């Protein structure tokens, strides 16, 4: 495959160039190429069919992932935000027969794997059931979902390489030589952009542990630790979710040394949620080359991305070369040429055209604009339609607001559940008033409730997006009480 051809090429042409690095270890392209075939053979000889991978970010995660791809073994990354119950469900429902990571009940110890970067425990068991997989499946990535159990999206290596090839082409003018992974590698976006794309282009993927970056659990992040990590690990590129972009701007404003170092950035991609154009403008004024993109697991991750050779503020960029985007009559975004192989355990054939569930439009220059989720469109009691994602993106400009979720469907007024930034209670009301001045009357925040959403990780997806139905049910009594004065 293209990925391993490129690694072998750079092992010959630039053997001593760094390919992978962590705080403890570094592997050149030559060393990486020497490590992968024996490790792939070891996994293959063990008779492994489906391997569940539950490790922190680091070189072991990368080496196992790459070796499995080389050996034709299906990799099943276990998302770090899954509860113990969800982890057990994933292991059972996926038919995994091998596990690298912490012990789970019912798994037997096998001979540990000896890697140049250390020893890894290997656990085995015979699956009680083996759900069928689409032919060619190389990875099962689990969507974070908004309701119910997450779905296993089956992807082939060829599909993932098509996405990575397009990304490498779009980012090429930035001449990225080193990338720093800030998101978990279990996230398909970082797996592709933070590991595969650098290796395709001869760059170095720097992979610190999540703890070294300041992450704790699924949604807690210590800003001071992140700032120290960014100072320690100079980089040319980052991939961020909107909340991380907001934090990065705040850190740059408060830390001149960090702002000076980040001036060396050549490409910063942001996705995973709607981003206010004003937030990107602020980043660019600070010298950060931020480009918004869009994608979904069912399409192998990234579908569209702005880049150095073409950028339209407020859009998510032009579609990548490997796929085609069209807009349905009702405004839903449709994607062709990038469909997944199918869902794990589903017999339904995968349509050639993926209905994304997102609403948007293509402008005259071919840039894609996202307006919101089709199922999230809210209609007020006065018949006005609006997408809550739009209001929530505008709220990103309010320093006092850490997270916000808007509810107003069928109601005469909109209620916002707001998680304030620490120590900003006195500023919150003023900033909400300023936000309302920028919004039409039907989209304004009429009532708001302070809530600690990060204390309820089950209410958020892996990248911090709200699980709206769960949030509504969890806080329905408080929301109803807010509206009582309007409806009585």
Features from the language model and the residues they span:
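Conserved AMP-binding/adenylation subdomain of ANL enzymes
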Residues: 161-178, 185-237, 242, 246, ...
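Gly/Ser/Thr-rich phosphate-binding loop
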Residues: 201-203, 235-239, 249-311
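Conserved AMP-binding A3 loop
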Residues: 28-29, 138-164
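AMP-binding/adenylate-forming catalytic core of the ANL superfamily
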Residues: 336-337, 359-443, 447
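Conserved AMP-binding/adenylate-forming core of the ANL superfamily
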Residues: 16-45, 52, 56-58, 66, ...
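Conserved C-terminal "lid"/linker of ANL adenylate-forming enzymes
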Residues: 403-406, 436-488
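Conserved pre-ATP/AMP-binding loop-to-beta segment of ANL
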Residues: 125-142, 149, 172-179
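Conserved ATP/PPi-binding loop(s) of AMP-dependent carboxylate-activating enzymes
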Residues: 315, 319, 328-353, 367, ...
């Amino acid at each position: 495959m293209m990925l391993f051809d490129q690694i072998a090429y750079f092992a010959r042409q630039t053997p001593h160039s760094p390919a992978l690095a962590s705080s403890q270890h570094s592997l050149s392209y030559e060393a990486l190429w020497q490590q992968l075939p024996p490790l792939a053979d070891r996994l293959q000889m063990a008779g492994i069919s489906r391997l569940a991978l539950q490790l922190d970010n680091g070189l072991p995660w990368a080496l196992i992932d790459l070796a499995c791809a080389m050996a034709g073994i299906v990799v099943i990354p276990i998302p770090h935000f899954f509860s113990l119950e969800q982890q057990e469900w994933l292991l059972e429902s996926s038919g995994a027969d091998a596990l690298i990571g912490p012990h789970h009940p019912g798994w037997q110890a096998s001979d540990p794997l000896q890697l140049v970067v250390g020893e890894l425990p290997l656990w085995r068991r015979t699956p009680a059931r083996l759900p069928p997989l689409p032919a060619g499946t190389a990875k099962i990535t689990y969507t974070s979902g908004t309701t119910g159990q997450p779905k296993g999206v089956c992807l082939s290596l060829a599909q993932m390489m098509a996405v990575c090839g397009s990304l490498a082409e779009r980012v090429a003018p930035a001449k990225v030589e080193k990338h720093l992974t800030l998101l978990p590698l279990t996230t398909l976006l970082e797996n592709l952009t933070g590991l595969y794309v650098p290796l395709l282009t001869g760059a170095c993927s720097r992979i610190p542990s999540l703890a070294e970056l300041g992450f704790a659990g699924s949604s807690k992040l210590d800003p001071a630790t992140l700032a120290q990590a960014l100072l320690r690990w100079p980089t040319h590129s980052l991939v961020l979710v909107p909340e991380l972009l907001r934090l990065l701007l705040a850190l740059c404003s408060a830390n001149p040394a960090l702002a000076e170092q980040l001036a060396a950035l050549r490409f910063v991609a942001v996705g995973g949620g709607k981003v206010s154009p004003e937030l990107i403008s602020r980043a660019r004024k600070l010298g950060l080359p931020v480009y918004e993109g869009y994608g979904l697991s069912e399409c192998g991750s990234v579908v569209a991305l702005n880049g150095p050779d073409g950028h339209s503020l407020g859009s998510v960029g032009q579609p990548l070369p490997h796929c085609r985007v069209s807009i349905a009559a009702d405004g839903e975004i449709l994607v062709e040429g990038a469909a997944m192989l199918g869902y794990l355990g589903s017999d339904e054939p995968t349509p050639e055209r993926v209905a994304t569930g997102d609403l948007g439009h293509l402008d005259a220059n071919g840039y894609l604009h996202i307006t919101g989720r089709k199922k999230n469109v809210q209609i007020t009691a006065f018949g006005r339609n609006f997408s809550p994602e739009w209001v929530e993106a505008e709220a990103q400009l309010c320093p006092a607001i850490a997270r916000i979720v808007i509810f107003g469907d069928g109601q005469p007024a909109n209620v916002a559940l707001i998680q304030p930034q620490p120590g900003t209670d006195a500023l919150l009301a003023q900033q909400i008033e300023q936000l309302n001045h920028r919004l039409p009357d039907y989209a304004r925040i009429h009532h708001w409730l302070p809530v600690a959403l990060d204390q309820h990780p089950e209410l958020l997806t892996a990248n911090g997006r709200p699980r709206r139905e769960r949030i509504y049910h969890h806080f329905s009594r408080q929301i109803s009480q807010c509206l009582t004065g309007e409806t009585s």
